[in-house]
């Protein structure tokens, strides 16, 4: 993938302004120089050697389940769900899984904005503070990009359960990205993952999925929306000429199959990542893409919880644009609306009645500053886009969403770094940039200044 969101450590941190860190803020880890104690009601919990986070002190991840009769019922998941120690794994999701829910505000992203971004808005930039505060409240997906982050899913779902039990109306749904394939990011370097196929990576990945499944079963009364493995399947459509991708093909397919079958649960809706218009929207790529995604769906037994595909994740394409930008190089399928409407019939013809979600987190300014459509790293001239909504105007599109947390880097511009990718050093990439997933203040400012609609 071109980035790894919600990184394990925050880069370019200013000295801590407060003696105590806020709930869900970072409180420790290798190289951390900020506050190491938490506000009342929170405890500093070490997730790994790089990252510790202030989590609710009363939070428990016990696998002992209690029975409830006050489960959430919505138009997208008929019937109530009872939390018991024995769950029948027969997915029942139908209809738009976003309908009837409000989306969870990512606490980690919110803490980045509150504890890093806003204090850094000084001088002439101080006028952006209200917009930054508003951006922190926009729901975005939580990235489970290393196995060590999986326990945070339980923490956040416990918080959602508590808010729903307190009468949240509409009830809250959680949003997560499953992103830890072995030999991840096979066609780039910026977001190489923790598992290697040559070192038991497939089994490590299955263990990672099992941990996620256990949490989803425990919180079966909480509605959860998942994006599955950004870039992975799209790489199998176009990049098998890259040795790492060719070597990873069978592992990617096996692991994706395992993910969508094991996570096929009544409280879950899944979307496979499907690249974007500038990747798979070319005439030569549409049918091969449809063949691959329909095959994955069929090979997994047509899981009821596999709702469809996610597009434009961490990218910049417009949802709908009147005039194709010059960098789209003459492809008439130059926005995400045209892309999904070109792909959907090809999928349907093979038995996959897919619906879609599109990431609008960074596509607010059109055209962008891209010099080439394939330039993906920290692109200049971008802005926050449409807020998450089911008011899409297209029956194929379930929702606009923010999958990529805006302000987290796509990759480092440091040419000496192990994960340096040349795209992050291009003239249309904002520089200097920190490692993928870490906070990039200048990029956040750019997104705020170019936001459309503005905050």
UniProtKB/Swiss-Prot annotation:
Residues 59-92 are annotated as: Thr-rich linker. Disulfide bonds join 27-44, 38-54, 186-245, 377-424. The keyword Hydrolase applies. Residues 66-86 are annotated as: Disordered. The active site is at 185, 231 (proton donor), 410 (nucleophile). Keywords: Carbohydrate metabolism, Cellulose degradation, Disulfide bond, Glycosidase, Hydrolase, Polysaccharide degradation, Secreted, Signal. GO terms for cellular component: extracellular region. The keyword Disulfide bond applies. PANTHER family: 1,4-BETA-D-GLUCAN CELLOBIOHYDROLASE C-RELATED, PTHR34876. Belongs to the glycosyl hydrolase 6 (cellulase B) family. This is 1,4-beta-D-glucan cellobiohydrolase C. It comes from Emericella nidulans (strain FGSC A4 / ATCC 38163 / CBS 112.46 / NRRL 194 / M139).
């Amino acid at each position: 993938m071109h980035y790894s969101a919600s990184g394990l450590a925050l880069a370019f941190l200013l000295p801590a302004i407060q003696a105590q860190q806020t709930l869900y803020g970072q409180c420790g880890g290798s190289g951390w120089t900020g506050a190491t104690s938490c506000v009342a009601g929170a405890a500093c919990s070490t997730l790994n050697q790089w990252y510790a986070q202030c989590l609710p002190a009363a939070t428990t991840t016990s696998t002992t389940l209690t029975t409830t009769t006050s489960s959430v019922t919505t138009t997208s998941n008929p019937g109530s769900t009872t939390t018991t120690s024995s769950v029948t794994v027969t997915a029942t999701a139908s209809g738009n899984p976003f309908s009837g829910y409000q989306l969870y505000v990512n606490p980690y992203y919110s803490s980045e904005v509150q504890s890093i971004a806003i204090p850094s808005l000084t001088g002439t930039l101080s006028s952006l503070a209200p917009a930054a505060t508003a951006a922190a409240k926009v729901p975005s997906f939580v990235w489970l990009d290393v196995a060590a982050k999986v326990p945070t899913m339980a923490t956040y779902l416990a918080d959602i359960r508590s808010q729903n039990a307190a009468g949240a109306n509409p009830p809250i749904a959680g949003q997560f990205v499953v992103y830890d394939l072995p030999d991840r990011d096979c066609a780039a370097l910026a977001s190489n993952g923790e598992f290697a196929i040559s070192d038991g990576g497939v089994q490590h990945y299955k263990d990672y999925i099992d941990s996620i499944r256990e949490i989803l079963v425990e919180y079966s009364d909480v509605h959860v929306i998942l994006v599955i493995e950004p870039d992975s399947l799209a790489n199998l459509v176009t990049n098998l000429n890259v040795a790492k991708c060719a070597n990873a093909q069978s592992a990617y397919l096996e692991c994706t199959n395992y993910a969508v079958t094991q996570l096929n649960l009544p409280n879950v809706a899944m979307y496979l990542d499907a690249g974007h218009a500038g990747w798979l929207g070319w005439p030569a790529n549409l049918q091969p893409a449809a063949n691959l995604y329909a095959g994955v769906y069929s090979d997994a037994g047509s899981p009821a919880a596999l709702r469809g595909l996610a597009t434009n994740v961490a990218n910049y394409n417009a949802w709908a644009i009147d005039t194709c930008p010059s960098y789209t190089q003459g492809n008439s399928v130059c926005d995400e609306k045209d892309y999904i409407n070109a792909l959907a019939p090809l999928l349907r013809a093979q038995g996959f009645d897919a619906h879609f979600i599109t990431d609008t987190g960074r596509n607010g300014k059109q055209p962008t500053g891209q010099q080439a459509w394939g330039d993906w790293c920290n692109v200049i001239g971008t802005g926050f886009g449409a807020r998450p909504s089911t008011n899409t105007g297209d029956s194929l599109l379930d929702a606009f969403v923010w999958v990529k947390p805006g302000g987290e880097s796509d990759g480092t511009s440091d040419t000496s770094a192990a994960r340096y990718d040349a795209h992050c050093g291009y003239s249309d990439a904002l520089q200097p940039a920190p490692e993928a997933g870490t906070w990039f203040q200048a990029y956040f400012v750019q997104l705020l200044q170019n936001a459309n609609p503005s905050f």
